Amino acid sequence: MGDLPGSGSTAQPRDAAVTGTGGNSTAGGGSSVGSTAVDRPPSPARLSHTSEKHPKVTLTELNMLRRHRELCDVVLNVGGRKIFAHRVILSACSSYFCAMFTGELEESRQTEVTIRDIDENAMELLIDFCYTAHIIVEESNVQTLLPAACLLQLVEIQDICCEFLKRQLDPTNCLGIRAFADTHSCRELLRIADKFTQHNFQEVMESEEFLLLPVGQLVDIICSDELNVRSEEQVFNAVMSWLKYNVAERRQHLAQVLQHVRLPLLSPKFLVGTVGSDLLVRSDEACRDLVDEAKNYLLLPQERPLMQGPRTRPRKPTRRGEVLFAVGGWCSGDAIASVERFDPQTNDWKMVAPMSKRRCGVGVAVLNDLLYAVGGHDGQSYLNSIERYDPQTNQWSCDVAPTTSCRTSVGVAVLDEFLYAVGGQDGVQCLNHVERYDPKENKWSKVAPMTTRRLGVAVAVLGGFLYAIGGSDGQCPLNTVERYDPRHNKWVAVSPMSTRRKHLGCAVFNNYIYAVGGRDDCMELSSAERYNPLTNTWSPIVAMTSRRSGVGLAVVNGQLYAVGGFDGSAYLKTIEVYDPETNQWRLCGCMNYRRLGGGVGVMRAPQTENYMWCENSFKQPNS
């Protein structure tokens, strides 16, 4: 394959085909007198065409007719506002209108139809959507749009409203959004709001919405095994805060609620000193029985096997798992800006917001729960710019200071709260320069250079050292390895790999450094090896199922993933995962895009399931 695009590569996937016209022909297209071809009837000429513009143009013209009130055959009276429309358009978009206008209902024969229980502004927006396929959902209209979309059975609008509300979730409003979702039967939003409430319960319990909960919803929350609390004391304190917000009306529910607090899991000191001494608890016989049950559980450990039940079961909150991001790279002959996210729990790749620039040979690392994309090549220029991604907002920002040198095929890693950029090339030469970024100062500063120039280098952090592994010195691939000691600002050589590798993948897994794939002097590689820092030795592991140069390697939820690359003939979107116990690789699905020379990064899954980005998405405010 040679070096990555942007560094002199001319490699392309071998999937092009040469096509030509069938039948007999002569040079210049002239006919041949006496040819036997005249004995056969010529094939009829055909040209098949499907217009991509036609649907949009047709809708635009229909909307113009509506705006001018031409050929309209129905008027919707909504809250005193008259909205002109065409029955066929409304029926095609809405099952509600289809049933109204094509059945035997009285409205099917009326030219003016009154619609009740829908906000007139929401109806106007929904009718506009039927004609334009465009809508803006925002905080000021979502609470009227969603009920209207539910009534009119506009599923697409229901979904986008729910997605908008998911993005708005925070500890102060998640209970209100949950109730709203429940009222309008939005099951997915209800599920997400429940998960958010459980995970953020320690903040939710401080909100006014929590204090206003009806007793049934309070019970639903505190009985969950997945409630995320440091101890059961927090659950008891939350219940008592809720009770004391309106003691006169709520004290009758104390026993009903307290039975879902896992009193046997409290410390003896808290159970006796706080729960047992509370006047409201002591004044209720059923509550006293619950306290006595908890005391017996704590005082009689030999009897605990006979006392097991919901109140003795420890809570097991669902921890946010890790997700893998694939960033930029080279695809279909050009650098790309696209970014996608892999969730191992669902085995699903989803597009997220793209970078502002196309980047191949980009260095990627995670620092302070933010994903950094460093340098690369945009298909025309070498870059020194940096972008930073926040998974909570699904947005990239470009306010990060640039590196002092342009760099593509650069290695990037985090050590001691600094972001390091190692080697690469600047379009003139292969680099041994190393610099590090301080996020507090938003500033890059140079550190000691490597002893060897390296592009396509892999970097890893283990035991307080930064390792630079393989790459190319601009002439040939390397198997040498050196490591940086930040305490002495010095690079020292360690044992070399068994194989020369440039554009390899590298990751730390179970206290080993794994190096996989890449390219040697002749071909793309599937081989893999790992480094033991205790013995300063490299040892081989089983080869991957595919040759992969320009591959990304990352550890996600305790598993090692190899992502994308180039196999010598085609760019890859396949993924494989390594099992150290069986020493085997297995295929694990595909990305949406083929990627060579993209970066990979691993982060905790965001607390809210934000919008996934797509080119045809609805317009969203501030997105």
From Swiss-Prot:
The modification Phosphothreonine is found at T19. Kelch repeats lie at residues 323-369, 371-417, 418-464, 466-511, 513-558, 559-605. Residues 20-32 have a biased composition (Gly residues). SMART domains: BACK, BTB, Kelch. GO terms for biological process: negative regulation of synaptic assembly at neuromuscular junction; proteasome-mediated ubiquitin-dependent protein catabolic process; protein ubiquitination. Residues 174-276 form the BACK domain. Probable substrate-specific adapter of an E3 ubiquitin-protein ligase complex which mediates the ubiquitination and subsequent proteasomal degradation of target proteins. May have a role in synapse differentiation and growth. This is Kelch-like protein diablo. It comes from Drosophila simulans (Fruit fly). The gene is dbo.
